[in-house]
């Protein structure tokens, strides 16, 4: 090999080596450094332990099994977990249950945020600080609907977290959690924001932040930080089929939590807006049946009598597209928006009614302490009118008592389901039909007349009440 060619190869090798070093340095710079954030934020993160007295259901001394024949390892296990204790004269011994969670200090005088499920039904709450000192905590108040609890400990000049704005959080942004998974204090995990505005079952009023941050038992109630060291959420739940972390974690937005904590601090309870409707998601078939361009909005399946919606003129079958200018993309968006308003607030709804857009002004009510009782549907007495169409159902008029119980002006109850579309979509005897093809049903006779003229090969909606709960379903009639 000639000297010039060797020099050329050496120059190329050096260039490649330098390029690799540059790329490596850039990659290192691209990865976030959490050390400063953790050092500054950790002192305000606390471990929360609770104690609760429960009736003792352990096996009594006279009922203990014979452990002598067991191997030493198993014998020690049972002796440790099933200690022989004498019964009290009344036999009403108590045992103590303990739980573990996390929290964070939001004020230097000792207010602490955590999850409601961490401290629910606790007889004693202990907050352990980062210096391992322990303080008794007083429960200021809880809000089970958002799973937020506010505690108070006696203290001065306590370290506090910085509060951020969860509305400014972006999908793909780095986030970090500090907590006590399985009791390991101040464990740090990191990840990114996977989605915003998630709705989980039984958590209608929380637009959850979804992340892939590793969250495990004991992390509940701990803070979720952004890269500025600000708390943007409270780690609350995970989705799992194994009992452990599977990459899906959910945090309560700090904006929601602070609003709740302010109300708990001031009033000891939380009040939120209420519309008084039962809503459901608008899928592709429902969108077609209601004349919508695409699936969007919240379909009103039921309007509660004397509720704010009923007084404002909202009707069953209306599709709510926006509230105060904020679009309702999914039905779950509506409770989030309504819940942030106070009783007496005015709101403007954009709705679709009978295929036409219109605006409706409503006055928001106060959320009842308990869920409203909307009645329970029962079977009907009397003769059934045979449906002479391809739905395959026999129906009869509702009795006056049933109409009153279900708060309906009309409708029919299914007496029998034959082979056909009704059976295919899961209708059952006892189901109540109040609307068919966007028309209110007054009687069995009207139901039969409407059914005869149903369009073919097009989605048709039907409003059905089962055990008092209303929902719209769709079906298609073939040629």
UniProtKB/Swiss-Prot annotation:
The keyword Membrane does not apply. SMART domains: PDZ. It comes from the Bacteria. Its EC number is 3.4.21.107. Keywords: Hydrolase, Periplasm, Protease, Repeat, Serine protease, Signal, Stress response. PROSITE patterns: PDZ. Might be efficient in the degradation of transiently denatured and unfolded proteins which accumulate in the periplasm following stress conditions. GO terms for cellular component: periplasmic space. Residues 264-355, 361-468 form the PDZ domain. Substrate binds at residues 218-220, 275-279. It is found in: Periplasm. Its main location: periplasm. The keyword Ribosomal protein does not apply. InterPro entries: PDZ, PDZ_sf, Pept_S1C_Do, Peptidase_S1_PA, Peptidase_S1C. GO terms for molecular function: serine-type endopeptidase activity. This is Probable periplasmic serine endoprotease DegP-like. It catalyses: Acts on substrates that are at least partially unfolded. The cleavage site P1 residue is normally between a pair of hydrophobic residues, such as Val-|-Val. One of its GO terms (biological process) is proteolysis. Residues 368-395 are annotated as: Disordered. It comes from Pseudomonas putida (strain W619). Pfam families: PDZ_2 (PF13180), Trypsin_2 (PF13365). It is an enzyme of class 3 (hydrolase). Belongs to the peptidase S1C family. The active site is at residues 117, 147, 220. Residues 1-27 form the signal peptide.
